[in-house]
Amino acid sequence: MSWLEKIFNTSNIVSSRKASIPEGVWTKCTSCEQVLYSAELERNLEVCPKCDHHMRMKARKRLETFLDAEGRVEIGAELEPKDVLKFKDSKRYKDRISAAQKSSDETDALVVMKGTLLELPVVACAFEFSFMGGSMGSVVGARFVKAVDAAIENNCPLVCFSASGGARMQEALMSLMQMAKTSAALARLSRKGLPFFSVLTDPTMGGVSASLAMLGDINIGEPKALIGFAGRRVIEQTVREDLPEGFQRSEFLLEHGAIDMIVDRREMRQRIGGLMAKMTNQESPLVVPVDGSH
C-alpha cells in the first residue's frame, strides 16, 4: 500500500457523529414562517413572538394557563363517547374515537374545569380541536351542561373557549340535538343572572358557532380567528357572489358588530377577570381595572 493509499484509507477515518436534536425543540410559525424555540413559544402561550400570530392551543393547556394554579378541579371526565349508532364511513366511528383519544390525549373534544381566575370563582371549558376537529357530539354537549350546572351551583360566571368544526357527523341527529341542549342550558344560566363569556378561537365553525359560541353575554374573538358557519367556497356557490376578503375573520366580525371585542391571548386573564369583577360586583386584588375605551 502506497503512502497516498494509507492517508485515504477509510479504516483510518473516524466519523464524527451529527449532533442529534430532540424532536419538538423547534417550531415554525404558520404565519411568518420564522423558526421558533418551542419552549419560548409555550411561555408565550403559543403566540408567535415575531408576528403575534395566535397558533392553536391544547384545551387542557389553555385552561391551566387561564385559571389560577390552585384549586382547579376537572368536571365531567367520567363521560366518554359511545358508538350508539354503530356508524361507519370509510372507518368505524369506534376506531375514529380510539385514534382521536390516542393522538389528543383527551377522551373527547371538551375539557371542563372549575377554579378561580384572579381569585374570583369561575367555571371554564375549552374545545380540543385535535380531537376530531373539536366536533360537538353527545359527550361534548353533556360536559357543557355539567359546566353550566357547576356555574349555577357555585353562583359564578362561565367561560368557554371554542375551537370546533361544528357538529359531529358520526353521531348524526344526536350531535345536532346538542345545539338545542347547550342553548337551553345557557338560557338557565342567564335566568340566574350569571354571565357567560364566549371566547371564539381559530377556528369556530358550523353547529358550535350557530349555538353556544355566539350566545355569550360578551363574545370575545382572538386575533384573526376564523369564525363562521359554512366555508367561504360553499357560501359563494350558494349566493353566487364574490365575498369580501377576510369576511370570516374576527376583525371583520368586530367591525360589523357580530362580536364585542378582540383580546390578545396573553391579556385574556386580566381582561376577562376585570369584566367578571364588574359584572358580578366583586373585587379582587389581582384585577387591573378594565379600560372602558376598549
UniProtKB/Swiss-Prot annotation:
Its main location: cytoplasm. GO terms for molecular function: acetyl-CoA carboxylase activity; ATP binding; carboxyl- or carbamoyltransferase activity; zinc ion binding. Pathway: Lipid metabolism; malonyl-CoA biosynthesis; malonyl-CoA from acetyl-CoA: step 1/1. GO terms for biological process: fatty acid biosynthetic process; malonyl-CoA biosynthetic process. A zinc finger (C4-type) spans 29-51. PROSITE patterns: COA_CT_NTER (PS50980). Keywords: ATP-binding, Cytoplasm, Fatty acid biosynthesis, Fatty acid metabolism, Lipid biosynthesis, Lipid metabolism, Metal-binding, Nucleotide-binding, Transferase, Zinc, Zinc-finger. Component of the acetyl coenzyme A carboxylase (ACC) complex. Biotin carboxylase (BC) catalyzes the carboxylation of biotin on its carrier protein (BCCP) and then the CO(2) group is transferred by the transcarboxylase to acetyl-CoA to form malonyl-CoA. This is Acetyl-coenzyme A carboxylase carboxyl transferase subunit beta. It comes from Aliivibrio fischeri (strain MJ11) (Vibrio fischeri). The lineage of its organism: Bacteria, Pseudomonadati, Pseudomonadota, Gammaproteobacteria, Vibrionales.
